[in-house]
UniProtKB/Swiss-Prot annotation:
PANTHER family: PROTEIN PREY, MITOCHONDRIAL (PTHR33505:SF4), ZGC:162634 (PTHR33505). Gene3D superfamilies: 2.20.25.10. This is UPF0434 protein msl4429. Signal peptide: none annotated. Disulfide bonds: none annotated. Coiled coil: none annotated. One of its GO terms (cellular component) is cytosol. Belongs to the UPF0434 family. It holds the Pfam family Trm112p.
């Protein structure tokens, strides 16, 4: 899974890492949004950034999801199935 980083390079998130990560507030699952390079917690309504391939799992660094973001279909995972 990849998204563009700040310098235009692709940022990859290992699918196995995604399976292990959980929202630090709800302990629930996260979804990868490759378009924004964020890990999404729909329950907490937060989007955690991924910088240089490293998930920043601090609630203070997370973006609050809008009502539209929460209601939107979950992002599709890219890469091999």
């Amino acid at each position: 899974m990849a998204a563009d980083g700040r310098d235009g390079k692709k940022i990859d998130v290992d699918p196995k890492l995604l399976e292990l990560l959980a929202c630090p507030l709800t302990k629930g699952p996260l979804a990868w949004d490759p378009e924004r390079g964020e890990l999404i917690s729909r329950v907490a309504k937060l989007a955690y950034p991924v910088r240089d391939g490293i998930p920043i799992m601090l609630p203070s660094e997370a973006r609050t999801l809008s009502a539209e973001d929460v209601l939107a279909p979950p992002p599709r995972l890219s890469g091999p199935a």
